[in-house]
Amino acid sequence: MKKIQSTCNLCALACNLDFYVENGKIEKVSPTVDYPVNQGFCCIKGLNLDKQQTKIKARKTPLLKDENGNMKEISWEEGFKTFAEKMTAIQEKYGKESVAFISTGQIPTEDMALLGHVGRNYMKINGDGNTRLCMATSVVAHKQSFGFDAPPYTLNDAELSDTIIFIGANPVIAHPVFWGRVRKNTTAKIITIDPRKSETAINSDIWVDIKPKADLV
């Protein structure tokens, strides 16, 4: 079995993993012991990367659920017609704002542009995306705080800081590798600002339980 070292692609922490490959298939995943980022540890998401190898063939025709809950193939013409009729009926009954779309960061730019064009100009609906709720906010925050749009700090700072503040973040669950580095700093005061009493809030020195939705301002 061949061992190949590579970087986990599931978050920006960039942990290093050892992939054990046989006959072109990943059979086992384990964290790289001496890598400086994750230091021999990784989260359950990285450990299960071998489960993401199933290739799903793209469908050539749409599927429509019948009255019994079974999926049947229909033509593209019927698919577009059915979608348009159903969406129009919903908007006529409940108003234009009853329908919205949210996009992902995992589709090509051209597809994203088409989705936005159809949504705004034809369906007259609101849309949002993963980008604005995720990295776009980080980019603006970094630029306003440090003068450029990338984080200037390193993981070592978590082990050396006097005070660490988490705002709406739950690294105990979302980024356990980073949280492990934080816990190595036994003298730091940890403050969590979050309307939820999250796992990170429970493990903090101070939990500031602000009003729900106030963290979106």
Residue positions per predicted region:
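N-terminal export/assembly segments and adjacent metallocofactor-ligating motifs
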Residues: 1-215
